[in-house]
C-alpha cells in the first residue's frame, strides 16, 4: 500500500500553529511532547482508549508512564488514527518503517516540541487507509460545528456546510442562441444545489447533455451498419473556414424580479466530486443545454451553439444574462447568492463541454477540470480520413449521440410540438457528418475546440486515462499542446479506461482539487506546488510520479525489419463464418488479434535499452496492396507475461468516503496490479488515401508507397527486457467499417520503422 500526496501545502511553524488553533488544538511550545499528544487525542473525535502505544502498553498506560515519546511510538499511534490495524496491517515497533514504506509524510528530525506539533499538523493532512485525509474524516465526525461558514486547513475548505439544509432550485436561463430559428432565444433549464449560507458562494458547474434523461430507443434505431464496404474517394483538397455562430441579444422586457424559485427538485444524478464541494461551500449547477428535456432547441451536438447554451449560465451568474422562474418568462430571478466565479467539472461529454466552454473565454470561468473530454469531435468519430467508432460503440456517430441526448422527445407535449423539426434537422446532421468519405469537413471544423485555444483564460486541469479507448488520449494531448505557452495547466494521467478517479485510495485527488478550487474561486493565494503532469506508473502498484510535460522531443527509430530483405503480408478477407462471428462480438476478434489468430502481420521488437514512451508513436510504412482503396489498422502491445495495472477499478472498501457529514458516501477503489500476458500500449487507424487531414490522394494498385501516421499518445515505461509487438491489419471489428473485400497488403519491413518519442531521465 502506497499513498501519494499532492495536496499538502508547506506551511511555516507560525502558520501551522494558527491553523491548529482554529481546529481547537491550542498548544504552547513550552509543553512537553507527551502533553501535546494527550491533548491532541482528547480534542480529537477518536477513542483514545482503543489505541495501542507500545508492545506492552496502551495509550492511557503510556501517558501515565515515564517512557518518553519517540517517533516509533508516535507512528504506532498515528497509524491507528489513519485506520491501520496494529499487529495485522503493521507490526508494533516497526511503525516508523511501515509509514515510510507507505509514503506517508514524516518529520525527519529529532523529537522536539516544535517538531511534534508539525508532525501532528502534517498528520492531519495525511491520507487514511480508508481514503480521506485525517482532518476531513475528523470534521465529518464532528471536530467542527456545521455553521455554514468557511473553515480552512492547509489551504483546503472543510465540510462545515450543512447538507441537510441544501437549497434545490430549478430555473430557466436565456441563452444567446436560437438553434431552431424560431425567432426566440432558447431557454435552458438548470438545476441548482447550494448550501444555505450568508456567504457569497462560488459554483462548480457540470454541463451534461445526459443529465435530464436519454432516449435509448432512439439511439438504437439510429445506429449505423458497420458491415459496409470502404468508399473509394477522388483526389481533392478539403477547404474549411473558421467561424462561430452569432450570439443573439435578448429582447429587453421589464419583469418582476423575485429572489426565490418556485420550482424545486429532489432527485437526480450528481457527480460525487461536486457533492464533496457542496459541503465545503461551493454551489453545484447542472445544465443539459439545448435540445434537452424542458429546454428549447435542437441537440446540435458539440458545436458552439451547444457550448453557448452552457456558458449562458456563467453569464447569468455574473449578471450578463437573464434567468426566469418558469418557461413562461413571467418573473426574472438573479443569482444574488453567487460570487460569480465558476469551475466546470465532469467526465466524457461533460468534460467535453468544459473544453468547449473554456475556448469561448467567458468571463467568470476561472478553471476547468476536464476528465476524459473530447477536444475535437472529428477525432472521436473519425481518424485520418476513416470512419472510426469509439471503443466499445461500433456504429455510433454524432447523429446517434444527438438522438440519444435529444431528451425533449421524452415529454409527450414537446414531442408533439417539436419532433417534426427534430427529424428534419437530424437528417441534415446525418448528411453533413459524411460517413461515406470519413473526411474532415466544415461540420467537423465547427466542432473542433482546438482552433480556439488562444481564447482560453481559465486554468486547465486535465484528467485522462491512458487506457481509455472510448475518448482516446489524443483528446487530452492535443488540448494540452494547443494551449498557449505558459498557460496554467496540469494533467493527471492514470492507467484506467473511461473512469473517474476522485475516490481512489492511492492519491489525494479530491483534496488536491479542493486546494486549487479554493484558491481560484475564493480569491485566496494558490500555494499548491503542483507539477505539470502527475502520472500513474504502468507497472507498479499505487505509484504516482511527477513529469514536466506530456510529449517528449527526443525520438528513437526502431526498424521493423530484421534483415536487409524482409516482408510481411496479410489478407483482409474472412470466410463467412468467421466474419459473422467477429461481427457479432468484437471482443472475440480482439482476443484472436492479440493472440495472432486473425488476419494480421505481427512484428516483435526488442528494445535497445530501458525507455519511457512519452507522446504519440509514429509508424512509417512502405507498402502496397492490390486495390485502389484501403485502410490500415495498427496496435502495439507490451507483450509477455508480467504484472501490469488493470484498466478497471476494484472496490477496496464500500461506502467509506464521506463527502460531508454522513453525506453521499462513496466506495474506495483502486486499479489492481495483476499478471497478464500482454497490455495494449497504443493503437491507430488511417485511410490510405488520406496522407494528411486536408488532402485526399489517389491510390494505385500494386505500387509501392510510403505512409506515415501517428498512433494514440501515451506515457509508458518499458524495461530493456520487455518486448513490443506491432500488429498490422485492416478491418477492426470494434472500430472500423467491416470491409470484407479480398485485398492483400504487403509491407516492406526493411524500409519501415517505428518512431518513438522517449522521455529523458531528467524529466
Swiss-Prot record:
Record field: catalytic activity: Hydrolyzes Xaa-Pro-|- bonds to release unblocked, N-terminal dipeptides from substrates including Ala-Pro-|-p-nitroanilide and (sequentially) Tyr-Pro-|-Phe-Pro-|-Gly-Pro-|-Ile
Residues of the active site: 348, 468, 498
Protein's cellular compartments: Cytoplasm
Gene3D superfamilies (UniProt xref): 1.10.246.70, alpha/beta hydrolase (3.40.50.1820), Galactose-binding domain-like (2.60.120.260)
GO biological process: proteolysis
EC top class, as a word: hydrolase
Main localization category: cytoplasm
Record-listed E.C. numbers: 3.4.14.11
GO cellular component annotations of the record: cytoplasm
Highest taxon in the source lineage: Bacteria
UniProt cross-references to SUPFAM superfamilies, sorted A to Z: alpha/beta-Hydrolases, Galactose-binding domain-like, X-Prolyl dipeptidyl aminopeptidase PepX, N-terminal domain
Protein task: Removes N-terminal dipeptides sequentially from polypeptides having unsubstituted N-termini provided that the penultimate residue is proline.
Subunit description: Homodimer.
Name under which the protein is recorded: Xaa-Pro dipeptidyl-peptidase
Origin species: Lactococcus lactis subsp. cremoris
Protein encoded by which gene: pepX
